Amino acid sequence: MAKGGAKKAAAAAARAAANRMLADNRQARHQYEILETLETGIELVGTEVKSIRNGKANLRDGFCLIRNGELQLHNVHISPHSHAGAYFNHDPLRTRKLLAHRREIDKLRGQLDQKGLALIPLNIHLKGSWIKLTIGLGKGRKLHDKRAAEKEKQSKKEVKAAIARF
């Protein structure tokens, strides 16, 4: 009986490790109102994969563009791998191609034509053995919108704390 429980726990741990978060852009949800998300693949070289798996990616200043019918990721810093020589390492800020279906790219292009919308990288995570990037279609928030969202978040937190006391 204990043996079966150990197998289930090991399987659950393996699933959690196969779907873990590698990098997160927490600032994006503060600066943008995310209207829609899309999970895409990302074209990487070997040293980039090793660095991302070690958690050495920074999405904060990143953005996505559609050029020549392809999704591209710009300004995302992936640190050079520590155990690779200078010759074999990658450029930390290079433009990376994102992998998505043509109809998804066309849909995003149509939505981006609206004023004030942008494609923002939200997080990098593992899905099985594949590294995936979640991008969000976001509308920039004004300062008063950010304040209102912060007040709403604070009030929800206070209500939850009050309920927990009783």
Curated annotation (Swiss-Prot):
The keyword RNA-binding applies. The lineage of its organism: Bacteria, Bacillati, Cyanobacteriota, Cyanophyceae, Synechococcales. NCBIfam families: PRK05422.1 (NF003843), smpB (TIGR00086). Belongs to the SmpB family. GO terms for biological process: trans-translation. This is SsrA-binding protein. The keyword Heme does not apply. Its main location: cytoplasm. Keywords: Cytoplasm, RNA-binding. It is found in: Cytoplasm. Required for rescue of stalled ribosomes mediated by trans-translation. Binds to transfer-messenger RNA (tmRNA), required for stable association of tmRNA with ribosomes. tmRNA and SmpB together mimic tRNA shape, replacing the anticodon stem-loop with SmpB. tmRNA is encoded by the ssrA gene; the 2 termini fold to resemble tRNA(Ala) and it encodes a 'tag peptide', a short internal open reading frame. During trans-translation Ala-aminoacylated tmRNA acts like a tRNA, entering the A-site of stalled ribosomes, displacing the stalled mRNA.
